[in-house]
Amino acid sequence: MFRAELHRLAGRQAEALANADEAVKISRETGPAFLGPFALGALALASEDPTVRRAALAEGEALLEAGAVSHNHLLFPRDAIEAYLEAGDWEGVERSAAGLAQYTHSEPLPFTDFYVARARALAVLGGQRSSAESLTAEFERLRKEGERLGLRVALGEIVKAIEKMRG
């Protein structure tokens, strides 16, 4: 999964897809509850085929509901949020953010709080459901928080949103 993510971030889509496919195959052979949702999230991000993406997201969500190991409840929603953002599926973004928030409700984590707030702000912007002024302040806050947490990979969309809002 990590190789798939690195290839995807470097713009090597074919390699990302091959690595994600292999990760899903291995997770199915060895027990999908351990890394299955995480692998399926990587596949959803690596695939440019909407059918493959939707199937990977649906299967990952089903595995979480069936009872996957804890790290999947943190990493799959992060990737699902990204996949839904790329697809412009604001309901999917909101649903994944809500699931992540619910999972960490009793033990909040800065990592998940950041991704939940980021997802919700980007969904609001994408759905054009808020004033520019309030959203700009939230994106500025998220940019600072993302920098503080070292989550540089998540900052690109935030910076784009700030630039878009400033016109």
Feature roles, as predicted:
Residues 116-167:
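C-terminal structured "cap/appendage" subdomains that terminate the fold
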Residues 7, 40, 47, 84, ...:
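Residue at a conserved register position within TPR or TPR-like alpha-solenoid repeats
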Residues 22, 29, 59-62, 66, ...:
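The canonical alpha-helical register within tetratricopeptide repeats
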Residues 11, 48-51, 88:
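Residue-level detector of the short coil/turn that links helix A to helix B
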